[in-house]
């Protein structure tokens, strides 16, 4: 019994003498935190990119909604372009009265080219969208139908 008490006393004394982390333990903790931080930065970068693409698609859908408002008060008999930014053609309608300035989520200013083409189709209309920003675009080569808009259609801008 006395021998067992001595062992317990020595174990307790040894535990009392331990005062903190060794340098190796501290280094392991720092390395683990660094790995976790690196993984988090990569994951957050993807989330930010996707949210910018979602914002661009939302802008395109907002332009289509503005075009629908336009056709409600201005019936269209031939294909009409409702322009929100860029160089206006002689027959283009002004869409800026329906939507405030659309900001490019990938740049610092407005989109360089933004319009909706309204095409009569029997007793309804078809809407196609082009939205070009500083780095990304939707329908840069060919305008995209409004019912197919998704973030998968946001591509890198060409011709820079």
Task: Enumerate the predicted regions with their spans.
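N-terminal leader/signal peptides at the extreme start of proteins
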Residues: 1-19
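Flexible interhelical turns and helix-capping residues at alpha-helix boundaries
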Residues: 16, 37, 49-52
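N-terminal single-pass transmembrane signal-anchor helix
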Residues: 20-45
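Aliphatic-rich helix starts adjacent to a transmembrane/signal segment
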Residues: 44-64
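N-terminal alpha-helical signal peptides/signal-anchor transmembrane segments
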Residues: 60-77
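Extracellular/periplasmic head regions of type IV pilus-like filament subunits
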Residues: 77-138, 159
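Low-complexity, S/T/G/P-rich flexible repeat/linker segments used as non-globular hinges
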Residues: 135-160
């Amino acid at each position: 019994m006395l021998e067992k008490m001595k062992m317990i006393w020595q174990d307790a004394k040894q535990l009392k003498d331990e005062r903190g982390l060794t340098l190796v333990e501290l280094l392991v903790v720092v390395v683990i935190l660094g790995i976790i931080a690196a993984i988090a930065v990569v994951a957050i970068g993807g989330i930010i990119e996707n949210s910018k693409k979602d914002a661009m698609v939302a802008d395109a859908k907002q332009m289509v909604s503005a075009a629908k408002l336009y056709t409600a008060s201005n019936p269209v008999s031939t294909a009409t372009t409702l322009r929100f930014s860029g160089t206006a053609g002689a027959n283009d309608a002004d869409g800026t009265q329906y939507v405030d300035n659309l900001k490019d989520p990938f740049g610092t200013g407005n989109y360089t080219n933004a319009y909706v083409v309204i095409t009569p189709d029997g007793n309804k209309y078809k809407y196609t969208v082009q939205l070009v920003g500083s780095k990304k675009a939707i329908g840069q080569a060919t305008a995209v139908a409004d019912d197919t808009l998704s973030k998968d259609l946001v591509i890198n801008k060409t011709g820079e």
